[in-house]
């Protein structure tokens, strides 16, 4: 495990990582978590309202009690010992793709059409 200073060039770090840990005490949407999944990284995240909403019933992520360092360490150890990474990576990429800008724009476009023209 390594902790790095802030950088805008995160792609290289994602490429050399095996898991992504989001240990926030508060989080808005969690776009960085979606970006990590788009790079095939399974996620260990604080159990926050947004992470619970985004990751419920997802096989490529686990939630730990916010602030519970022992539980976080246990999940990190568990994930480090896993050998079935490929399916988790594929699931992460597949799920992150649902947040692709084109799909989000299409969803908004469809919603706005329903609002403007009524439900058909």
Locate each region found by the language model.
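C-terminal alpha-helical cap of glycosyltransferases
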Residues: 101-120
């Amino acid at each position: 495990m390594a902790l790095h200073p802030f950088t805008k060039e995160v792609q290289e770090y994602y490429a050399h990582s095996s898991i992504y840990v989001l240990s926030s005490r508060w989080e808005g949407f969690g776009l960085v978590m979606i970006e990590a999944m788009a790079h095939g990284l399974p996620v260990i995240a604080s159990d926050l309202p947004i992470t619970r909403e985004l990751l419920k019933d997802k096989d490529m992520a686990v939630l730990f009690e916010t602030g519970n360092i022992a539980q976080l360490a246990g999940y990190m150890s568990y994930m480090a010992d896993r050998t079935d990474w490929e399916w988790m990576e594929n699931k992460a990429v597949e799920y992150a793709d649902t947040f692709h800008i084109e799909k989000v724009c299409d969803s908004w476009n469809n919603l706005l059409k329903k609002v403007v023209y009524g439900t058909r």
